[in-house]
Amino acid sequence: MGLRLLHLNLHGLIRSHDLELGRDSDTGGQTLYVLELVKGLAARPEVEKVELITRLINDRRVSSDYSNPVEKISSCAEIIRLPFGPKRYVRKELLWPYLDDLADRIVQRLQKENKFPDWIHAHYADAGYVGALVSRRLGLPLVFTGHSLGREKLRRLLAAGIDHDQIEQTYSISKRIDAEELALAHSNLLVTSTKQESEEQYARYGRFSSKNVEIIPPGVDLNRFYSAEINSKDEEKELNKLFSPFLRDLNLPPLLAISRAVRRKNIPALIEIYGRSSILQQRHNLILILGCREDSRQLEKQQREVFQQVFELVDKYNLYGKVAFPKQHKREQIPSIYRWAAKRSGLFVNPALTEPFGLTLLEAAACGLPTVTTDDGGPRDILSRCENGLLVDVTDLEAFRDGLETAGSNLSLWKTWSNNGVEGVSRHFSWDAHVCNYIALMQKRLKFLAPRHWTLGNIKETNPIGQKIIFLDLDNYLEQSKSLSKLRNKLENNSLNNDIQLGILTGRSIKAARYRYAETQLPKPSVWVCQAGTEIYYSDENKSDIFWQDSITVDWNRKGVEKVLFDLKDYLELQSSEHQAPYKVSYLLKEPSDAILPLVRKRLRQSGLAASPHLKCHWYLDVVPLRASRAEAIRYLTLRWGLSLEKVLVVASQQGDAELIRGLTKSIIPFDHDSSLDGFRSQQRVFFSEARDGVLDGLKNF
C-alpha cells in the first residue's frame, strides 16, 4: 500500500483550477503552494491518496465550486470540503469559534472510514490548531507549516504604531499565537521555507524545537514559468491591451509588483519612492498587479485602505500615464506578464515588510526577470542561491530608491541576473525536486512514528449500555443543585435509564468523588473523569484507564511546573495535598484576575513544559499535561466506545466550562450559570435553560 496523506488548509478560497489569488487577504500564495504540493504529491508513485480538507462555503458572492463537498484534483487527489461555522464566506479571523467543530468532524470521518493517513500536514495557524487536536486524539504524526506567523505579525504591527487592542480586535492575534504554540507542541516535524524563518521567527515561540525543523523551499512549475525572448503574438496583444489604458509608453522597462492589496506587502511605499524619483519615472513604468476587483469600495477594509493610498499617491505625484493598476487579469496571464516585463529589461520588485518565502520571486526569476526585493525573510535564501538581483531595506526609503535606480542602470548586469535566475530556479527550486525532497524527509523523520490510534483494551468492560451519555459536574452543578430528587427520579426511570448513561466530571480523587457522590443517591455512573481530566475510572473499578494515562503523560514534568510557577507566589498558592495528583498541580488564586491564566500559560511555554493551565470558578487553577483536559477525556471515551459526539450531553455552568461546550457535543447551561458562558448563546448545540430544573429541561430534547 502506498502513502496516504492529509493536508489541512481551512481559510481562503481554494479549488483545483482558476485560483482566485489576490481576491482577498486570505487567498494568497499559501493557497497556491498547498494546491501545487498536493498535485505534486499525487503524481508520485509511492503515494496512494492525498486529501486536502478545507471549508464548505455556500455563498452567492463566491463561485458554487466552493460548495462542492468533494472535488477531484486527479485520480488519487481530492479536495474534501466540510461544513463548519457560517455557511457564508468569512475572513479567517472569524473562524476561531468553530475550529473545534471541524476537528471533531475530521476525527469522526477518519474513524468511520477506518483509513488513516500516514501523516497530517497543517497549513497556517488555524489548521495547526485543528491538526493538533486530530493528531492527539488519533495518534497521527503532525507536520506543521505556519506560512505567516502571529508573533511576527504582532511585532511588525506594533512597530508601525498600531495599538495592541486594535490589533487584537482586527486579527484575533492572541488566538492565532496560542494556536501556533499548540501546533508546535504537537508537531513531529516543522517545515519551513528558509533558515531565517526558522531561526528568527519560529524561535520566538516557547514550544519551538529546532530539532523538529526541516527547510524545504517551495517549487515553481517550470512548465508555466519559463524564459522566452517573446510571448506569442496573442499574449503580447492581450497584455498591451491590459496596460495601454494606463501607460503612455509601453516599451519603457517596467518595475513590476505582483501581490495582494494588504498592508504587509507595502505597495504604497513603492509608489512613494517612484513618485519622488525623477530618474525612476524617466526610465521606468510602474505596473501593479494587486488582485482583481470590480469596485474597490466593496472590498474588505484593509484592501480598500491600500487602494485608497494607491489612488491618492498616483494623484499626489501626478503619475498618470506612468503607473498601471488594472482591475482585472487572468491567473494564466501571470507567466506572460513576467515575460512581457523581462522582454523590456524590467525588474520585479517585492517591497513587502516581511516575506516568509517569496514564491513570486521564483516565478519572476524562472521567466528571466531580475528582482529588487525586501531583505526580510525568504528572499535572502533565494538570492543567495540564484544571484539574480538586489536585497534592500524597504523600511529605508532612500536605500530602497537607490537600489532600484542602481539595478535599472546597468544592462550588462541585468543580463547576468536574468540568466542566473533562470538557471538558479531550475537547479534549486523545481516542484519535482521539492516533492521528492519532501517525501524523503517525511519518511525518514516519521518512520519511527507509525500511527498508533487508540488501543481499545477490554472494551466490553468499559462500554456503557446506553446509546447516549450525560456528563454532570460533581464539584459545581451537583454541589449546588436543588433538584437532585427530581433528577434522581428521572434517571431511575427504566425507559430513560436503558437509553442514557451517566458520567461524572470532577477535580477530586476517585475516592473523594465516590464519597461525595454517594450523598446524592443518584444512579451509579458508567464512568468517572477525575482529577481535572487526568484520570478515568469505569463504574466500580478502582484502577484508572492506563491507555488514557499513557497518552497524556508524554513529557509531563510535575516538579518543573511547581518550580516555574513558584515565582508567581504573590498571585497563586498551592492547594493542600488532598487536592494534588500525579498529573495535576492545583493552585488557589489569592485574588481573581483575568490576567493570571495568560501569565501562567506564558511561563509554562517559555520553559518548554508540556503543560496546560485551566482556571475554574475564577479561583481554582489546575495545571495538567498538555494533552489532558475534561473535554479531551470525553473524546477519548467516545472513540473507545464508538459513540458519536452528538450522543454526548454535558452540563456546563461555571467559568472554565467553555472547553466542554466547544465542538460537536451537546450542552445544557442552567439558568444560574456564570456569565462567562453567555458567548455561546448563538451555538445551535447549546441549550440555555431558563428553568430552575435546568438539566431536566434540557433532557427533554436529548
Task: Go through the PLM ranges and name each one.
Residues 122, 144, 192-193, 373, ...:
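Short beta-strand scaffold positions
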